[in-house]
From Swiss-Prot:
One of its GO terms (biological process) is translation. The gene is rpsJ. Part of the 30S ribosomal subunit. Involved in the binding of tRNA to the ribosomes. Transmembrane segments: none annotated. InterPro entries: Ribosomal_uS10, Ribosomal_uS10_CS, Ribosomal_uS10_dom, Ribosomal_uS10_dom_sf. The keyword Ribosomal protein applies. GO terms for cellular component: ribonucleoprotein complex; ribosome. GO terms for molecular function: structural constituent of ribosome; tRNA binding. Belongs to the universal ribosomal protein uS10 family. This is Small ribosomal subunit protein uS10.
Length: 102
């Protein structure tokens, strides 16, 4: 797979879980003999939702909730077949969304 690059994007609501997953990916791929760039922290997406506290009246009383989406980017340059195989076998938490582009 000479001259190829694999780009992995991780998304999660918990920054600790995404950092552990990124560290696991980097360790696995470097052990298999490929070069890794990253993990690069991408900007955190923050969604704020405004909700009226009362079900019927008192519109001035509102409550704000926010959801933060943390993102990381990992590039694998010149991946070996062993690195790709070990990457496919890697067990990661369910709350981490993984996008892989070749």
């Amino acid at each position: 797979m000479a001259g190829q690059k694999i780009r992995i994007r991780l998304k999660s609501y918990d920054h600790e879980v995404i950092d552990v997953s990124a560290r696991k990916i980097v360790e696995t791929v470097t052990r298999a003999g490929a070069t890794v760039v990253g993990p690069v922290p991408l900007p955190t997406e923050k969604n704020v939702y405004c909700v009226i506290r009362s079900p019927h009246k008192y519109k001035d009383s509102r409550e704000h909730f926010e959801m933060r989406t943390h993102k990381r980017l990992i590039d694998i340059i010149d991946p070996t077949p062993k690195a790709v195989d070990s990457l496919m076998r890697l067990d990661l938490p369910a709350d981490v969304n993984i996008e892989i582009k070749l």
